[in-house]
Every structure is written in structure tokens, then in C-alpha cells.
Amino acid sequence: MNELNTVSTNSSDSTKNGGTSNSPDDMDSAAAASHAIKKRTKASRACDQCRKKKIKCDYKDEKGVCSNCQRNGDRCSFDRVPLKRGPSKGYTRSTSHPRTNEIQDHNNSRSYNTFDNSNNTLNNNTGNSGDNGINSNTVPSTPSRSNSVLLPPLTQYIPQVGGIPPSFQNPAIQSTMPAGNIGQQQFWKVPYHEFQHQRKGSIDSLQSDISVRTLNPNEQLSYNTVQQSPITNKHTNDSGNANGSVTGSGSASGSGGYWSFIRTSGLLAPTDDHNGEQTRRSSSIPSLLRNTSNSLLLGGQPQLPPPQQQSQPQAHQQKLQQGQNPYSYSQFSQQQPYNPSISSFGQFAANGFHSRQGSVASEAMSPSAPAMFTSTSTNPVNVAQQTQRPQGQQVPQFSSELDGNKRRQSAPVSVTLSTDRLNGNENNNGEINNNNGSNNSGSSKDTSQHSQESVTTPAALEASSPGSTPQRSTKKRRKSYVSKKTKPKRDSSISITSKDSAHPMTTSSTIAYGQISDVDLIDTYYEFIHVGFPIIPLNKTTLTSDLLLVNTQPISNIHEVNSYVILWFRNSLELLVRVALKQKPGGKFFDNIVGVALSPSNDNNKAGFTTATARDDAEKTRRDSHNEVQDTLEVQSVFIAALNECFQKIVDIHPKFRENNDQISPKIKVIYLSTFILLNYILAFVGYDNSFVLGMSVTIFNEFKLYKLLLFPEPDVNDVKAPVDEEANTGNGNTKTSEFEIGSESAGHMNPSNSPNSMDENISHYSVLFKRLYVLLSVFDSLQSCAFGGPKLLNISIQGSTERFFSNDLGSKWCLEQSQLRLKSVLQSLKLGELMSELTRNRISMNGNRKPGFDITNSSSLLSEYVETQPLSVAQLFCKLLIGKHNFINCLLSLYDSEAGVYSDLTLDLSSKIADSLCSLISIILQVLTLILRLNPTNSIDFNYRPPNPPANNPTVQEGPSAMGSSPVAGNLNAAPPSEGNPDFYKKLLGLKQDTGTILSDLCRGIISPFAIAILHEVYNITELVKQMPTSLISIMMTATTTQNTQDTKKSQDLVMKLSNSMNEVVQITSVLTMIKPFKIFEHELNKPIMSLTGGLSSTTRNDVMWPKSGQGLRESSVMKTLLDERRTSGTQPTTAPVAAEESRLENVALENFVSIGWKLLDDSELGWY
């Protein structure tokens, strides 16, 4: 045995030295003890990163890093303990425990107690009993072989003594269990004991089956897996202090009041080897949401706090809970006052799945999927409070099933990023590890460190990244494919976002959702996102009190679908919020994704951000370093992977929708379709071109036949204006919307909190939401068509849809926004989308019979009412800009007669017309930019720059918007340019002048918009094309004044003064453009190499340049001009007009330049803004 210890010691030493050992004594010793550990030479020892990716490692001592780690900015580490070799043929279980427990682990300088001393440990109530209980456990777990079906945990089938229901406990608590209970038999020969009065479920569904839990309906909101129920907590001292210490520190899921579906393995990620084994393993019974759909929804967020008296009897506990909602959902307004972060999303899955048979298979929900909702923060105060829990707690009788649960733990996540970038403060990490080693508390330390404390306030999200500094442990899991020789520490389930956690220094880790509480997600959405563009076309009250209250109890056949849809809707919303969160100086996209607190103070000390030299100024040098390029590419890949995952998961459930179309509630359908709107919003928000997401979204919407609701709206034309008290009286519209009807036995009908007929109301009311969703998707289709120049996929006209479907009565339950002023801002964004839809539907390139100078006066009339009566907003001004641009195009193209081939005479009246259109266009551009700069120049969510609360609805406020239209402020803002010697311009820019227009426009302060990047691109394109026109027109005016009379001369001087002001505005526009940075993830280059078309008045200095984004380089003519010329010449015979046109061209160079600008502006509208 001394020889065995010597071999183990040498192996540990060689591991610490990178696996290098040339000692003959070591080789002889390994040969003599081949049954224990075989020495590995340096040639077969790869660093942890290369081993994880299974690539060749060329590590050398003189270099200190392999080529792979050097390329990825990582460091080579050899922290992983090699796996033990398999036992010899004569291996028996009776001899395995003493031999195994005597092998010393030199990584943590601890020794494992032998199996013979485990009984003495049970009676020892010292502080170190927790570790002894962990290491003395001899219950073997199910071996994980490839393509094997895991048996369910044994403890689920062993009858409970005294009728005590089984509870899901920490594996560390198994030390108190008598060794002769279940450890004496081989696991495959243990007799099967079925629960009494319960059906037999499938193998893969037992751990998430509600029949296994045997929960009282009144306990469904407060039952805790690790925090024992009152009936089991009263016997803690009877079994020893070890388990009291374990549960006291919140080892499994944190005993701070987590719900029953927050399992230990749900909050923690498996280790390197364990996760790899799970990846290789597949289940024979597919499942939509394997293990627990409920454990996926909250992801370690703190929920209901533990009862105040945990030692009270169960009967008394049930009396306290009789007043609670017996269902697994509750309204936001019904939450307990001391628990503001209770999740309305996670409540939908509080009861688990009834069965897995016949469900849809999902790879992300398979047992091989890593945990998604991870723990990233630890509150030392809470840990201390948890450690001081009352002693009246019972050590659970059986707890070995958690090891089996951990093997089948499911949580969907597959977004990778560099773990080096997830590392926190290394100095603090060392202290944490030292404390862990001294406490030697095994399972009780790591989960309490890694159990997530949800960020319950948006201010906390801004103060530090979502989640505090994570912690790690250096102990890695060692397991054998044959048997468990030693009970591994719970460090094997370290959080996937912790420092150097279960994936040590590898290049892949997982994005953790669930770091923002669900209440904060909803509040953040309605505060910062909804006013800019309504992704969820419903007010907050109805959403939280009706739409999200979906029953997921097993009485429904489609509860899996409900939980699955709500889960990925929540994940998509959190992805948007994290992308939109304002980054702190020195921060990165990883801050908002994984919640690692990065700051300039410790940014220079983390590996992965520098390779050779430390940066003195991280904020400045990062932009010029090569690491910045790598960081940008990595951030983009992480974002794309996260977006694609959310999109793929929500698409995978569509076949299930078609199978259960009549049973699925319209609530779930609204949430499901809103998820597609949400994903398209994210694409538009970051300015990323992904036509596949939009195309599949259109396909899904067409599968639901939503277009029929817009094409044939006559049966339910009065749905929009229907108030709440008339819901029961509207009985029409069923024939046209049969696609969205729900069965009479659907779970969606269960809602005792509302009126009896609240869920049985006519489906026509939900059809209003479906119409809105279709209009929103058409808006994103139009936006992508305008931005990237692609064809529009939805050709149904949405003209007038804003008034018909969105501007409904505020008293209606289905209203879009309850605040009148905020509703007007929302409608302006929708009107912008409506205008873009009409512009894309009437493109010249898509309509061969149209002439180049088409009239859009009808589109202008659409916005006449809103332009005059609404508070100033970016969407409203951009609508004016698009209309002014098309009017300006018509004005410029009318200077050339394409039929006769001659230019018009440049008279004073024509020059005045061109100058007025040009000055108006430039003035609107400046107003757009200054308003963006004042409201939200970075288009980010900043909790320190919140939107103001709108005043209460009263007659004074109702008259506010109307009064603004006739106020001199609005008139001055539209008519008088800010540069006309107006000193109030800079006050308005800085928000110092609090007049009516400023106050009303401040309602959009801090609001994010999906149009921000597209608006900036279009503004820049127009500015680059027209910025030289004022100079050219002034030259023409000055030349023409010599031949004009006195009256014309005065008019020319006024035009020159007006054009001079426009030149000053162009300078301001150029300056403001550099101050607006709405870009996220992807960098957009605004200063494209576009040369001015009016560089001079001679044909030799003029440059006709096409956008380089066409991919064909520079050309001398406009794309649209060439296209229309070909159409015209193909339909008519060639004439001799080009000769006359040539003469006219030589005489009217300025006119030709203006016409060329008109063609280029038309190219911009037809080919895309980006």
C-alpha cells in the first residue's frame, strides 16, 4: 500500500509539472503497480486546451505555450488530473473501497478516509464532517457508457419509511445513509419498488415526473429540493452535523428558497470529462424538454424565500400555504412583497412533465446538453446566513438519486466563447481557493459559491455586469468508466461561467441565460424597448396578468410545448436586453452575455486580453492592437451562435404546433410568433443581414394563415375598438380564424384569477394580436429590404394598419399601451414602418411600368396628421426625411426630359425650387441627428438615463400634443433652421431648454430603436451626395444676378443666404455624425469611398461613381439610369435625339450634375442604404 501511495504521489507531481517525468524509479514503480496508475510520458501529455479540442499539442518548455493556445490568446495549463486506469481482471468491489480511499490527492493536500472509518464519521459532529461525509460515500453510480440507457435513480423506487415523500438531496448527504441499505447489491440487481398508487412512467421522465415528487398542490410554489421540507428538516441533529453544514451553506441549489425545479445539477455545469461523456451519450427515448422543463426556465434565480420556521410540522406548513394559488402560475401583482423577483416565466413549469412518451425530440434538451442557467454570483452575506440555519433540520434518508439526476440534467445552451475572457480577478480567485482548501467543506462550499443570486434590479445590472465575480475550485473530477473508486467532490459541477471551472482554460464555454430576473426583463422591455417599437403588441398589464399565465400542469397534453415556447421567448428577450445594455468603459459584449464583471481596473490583469505586453491604457490601445480584431471576430461569433440557437430552438417546435393545433392556447401562439418578431428585432438592432431568419419567419407566419386576417378583415372589423365589457358580446370571426382556435379542454382555459369567461372569450380578440404581429413582421421585412436592397417577401399592403389595429381605445384590455403619450410615440414608429413598406412595394426596380419620377404624394398624406399633432420623435422626423428625399429626387430628375433628351432651362424659379427642397432636406437631417444625440446617441439601455414617466392621463395632457402642433416652438423647429443665429439650438441639443417640444420629445429619452443604424446609414448617404449642392447653387445664383432685375436680385440674395445657412448645417451634420455610435457587435463603415458628384462645374472634374457595395467596383453611370434606359430603348426605336442631348449637356453642366445626384439618390433608395 505504501507503494501505491508512492505511485499516486508521483503521478500528482508529474501532473503539476505538466506531465513530464523521466525518473526511472517512477517508471519502475508504475510498471509494478499497473493496476493503479500508469505513468504518462511527456510525449503523450497535451495541455488542457488541446486535449479538450482533441488536437495535437506542440507544447515546449522553452516556449512556454503551444501554437494553438498562442493563436487563441490562451495559456497552456496542465491542471487536469489524468483519469485512473481501469481495474485488473481480478477487481472486486470488496477490495476497491479501502484501496481507493487510501490514495492521496496532492492537488488539494487532503487525504480521503477509508471506507472502514465511514461509520465513525457519521457520529462525528465536527466542522470537517462535511468532507468526510462526501468522501466516505460508497454508493456506486450508474456507469456512463456510450449509447447506454441510464436507469433511474434507485432512491425513487425504494419505499419511504413512515410515508415520508422522497426529496431531491445533495449527494454529499449520502454519507449519513447506512451502507447496507442499497450499497451492498449491484445496481442492476436492485429490486424494483414501484410507488404506491402511482403509474409507471418512462425511464427518462421519472426524475421530472410529478408522480415521483408527490407534491401537495399547495406546496408547488415553495417546495425546495435542497432546503428540506418542514417535515424532513426537523431531524438534522439526529444524523450529524455534516449534512447540516452541507445544506446550511446552500450546497445543491442554495438553500435560500429556490423552487423545487431548481435542481442542483441544473444550476451547475458538469465537468470536462463528465460533460464529454454526456455528449457522447444519447437517450433512447426522445424528449422535448428532458429532465425538467421547469429547471430550465429560471436558471438559478432566487425565488420564494425559505419559510421563516423551517422546523414546524408539515401540517402547519400546509395551513400557511392554503391561501396560495394552487396552480403553478401567479400574477405579478399577487407576488409576495418580500420577493419581487419571483418569475412569471418559471412558474409555468413548476410541476414538471407528466411523461416523455410521444414528445418531440430536441437535441438541446437531451441529457447531453450542458446546463444553460448557470450560477454566476455569490452573495457572501447570504451564504453566511444560510450557514447559520436552524439546527432543526433532518438529514435526508436517501440522496443518491441526485447523481443520476445530474447525469440526465438538461439545459439548452450551446454558445461558445473563450473561457479566458470569462476569468475574473485572479488574485481573488487564489484567496477563494485557499479558503476552500482550509474549510475543506466539499459539496457545501462550491454550490453556495456558484449558486446564482439573481439581479433583481436593473440598477444592479448597470452597477456591475449581471452577476458578481464568479469563483472556481482547482479540484477536477476524476471518474472511471467502470466504477466510482472515490466519491468525487461537488467541484465537478462548477458553474460554467466560473473562473477556470469545469472547462479549464479551454476555448469554449457556454452563455448562461437566466441571469436577469423575469420581472426585470419585463420591466426593462416596457421601459426601454416597447415605446421605440412594440415587439410584444400588448400592454404590460394584460401581458403579465393574462397572456403569460399559461398552465403547464400535467392535465394538459401540450404542457411541454407551453414551457418550451415560454423558455425560448424568455431567452430571446434576455439576449436582446444583454446586447442592448450599455457597456462600461473597457467592457465587452461578454459582460452582458455571461455576466462577468469587467472593469478597467482589473482588465489588464486577465489572461486572454493581452498576449505579450500589458496594456497601459486598455481603452485606447485596444482599438489599435491586433487583439481587438480577434476580440471583434470572437464577439461576433458568440452573438451569431446565440441568435442562431434561439432561432433554431423556436423553429424546431413548429411541427408540434401543427400536430396539436386545436389544443394549443392562442396565448402560446402569440408568444410563439412574438419570438420571431423578437429575433428579427435583434437583427435590425445590430444591423446584421440574415435573410434566413426573416425568410423562415415569413414561412411560419404563412403556415398560420395570418395573411387571411388582413385580406379578409370584415368579420371582425370592430375587434380593435371593443372594450373589456363587450368581450362576451362579440361572437363573430370564428370562421376566418379557425387556425387559432383552442380546444375546449386546453390548459389555457384554466385561470381562476380572472373572470370565468376571461379565457373563454371569443377568439376574435386574439385575432387583433395576430394582425398586429403580421404587421410587425411586414415592417421588419420592409426595413431589411430598404437597408440591404433585397426584394420584399410580404407584399400585402399594410397601409392604414396603424389606425386600424394599434390605435385602439385605451379602455380595452387589448390596447397597445396604457399611456396616451407613450402610445403616440409607439404609433410614430409604426407609421415609419408603414411608410417604408409602401416605398419598398412601389420600387421602380420591382415595377417595370413605372417612370423614374414617380409621385409619392399619397404616402405623404399618410403622415400629414401625425407630423402636425404628435410630439417630436426620431421616427417622425425620419418619415419627413424619406418623403423629402423622394420629392427631391422627383425635382432633380424632372430637370431632364428623357423623351426629348434635353435639359430644362435653369431659371430663377427653378433654382428657387431646387434650393428650397435642398435646404429643407438638410435641415431635417440636422434635426434627426441632434434629436438622436440628445435622446440616445448609443442606442443602448442605460439605467442611469431612464425615460421619464409620462404624466397621468388628464385633459391637460390630452391637449398637449395638439397644442404642440400650433405652438411657435414646433413651428420654429420645423421652419427655422437651428443655425440661423438661434442661440436656443445648443440648449435644445443639451436638453437645457425645457419647452413643450423638448418635454414631449423627452418621452423617448433612453429608448432604443431597431431603426437607429438604418437611419444613420441613410442620413450619411444623403449628406454625402448633397453636401456640395449648396455651393454649386450659390455659384449659379451669383452668376445669374448680373442679368436680372432688382426684384429678381433680391430674391437671389435671399436664396444665397438660405444656401449659406445650409452649408453651415452641413458642417454641423458632419460633426454630429462622429458623435453618434449606435453600432452593436458589428462595425458599420459609414465613410464609404463615395466621391461627390458636384466636385466641379466641368465635365472633366465631375465623377459619376456608383456605390461600391454593388460588388462590381466603380462605374460611370447610375444603375437605375442604365436599367431604365435599357427598358426604354427595348420598347422604342432609337432616334437622333442624342445629338441634341450632347449639345444641351455641354451647355448645362450644372443641370447634368444635379440630375446625376438625383439618379444616385434613386440608386440609394433602390439598392439599399447599407
From Swiss-Prot:
UniProt keyword annotation of Cytoplasm present: yes
Biased composition (Low complexity): 113-138, 239-250, 293-302, 309-341, 385-397, 424-444
One Pfam entry name: Zn_clus
Residues with the Phosphoserine modification: S202, S205, S208, S229, S283, S284, S410, S414, S1130
SMART domains, sorted: GAL4
Region called Disordered, residue ranges: 1-46, 77-148, 217-254, 269-288, 293-343, 384-506, 725-757, 946-974
InterPro entries: Carb_Metab_Trans_Reg, Zn2-C6_fun-type_DNA-bd_sf, Zn2Cys6_DnaBD
Coiled coil residues, start to end: none
GO molecular function terms listed in the Swiss-Prot or TrEMBL record: DNA binding; DNA-binding transcription factor activity, RNA polymerase II-specific; zinc ion binding
Disulphide connectivity of cysteines: none
Family annotation (PANTHER family): GLUCOSE TRANSPORT TRANSCRIPTION REGULATOR RGT1-RELATED, GLUCOSE TRANSPORT TRANSCRIPTION REGULATOR RGT1-RELATED-RELATED
Protein name stated in the entry: Glucose transport transcription regulator RGT1
Organism, scientific name: Saccharomyces cerevisiae (strain YJM789) (Baker's yeast)
Gene from which this protein is expressed: RGT1
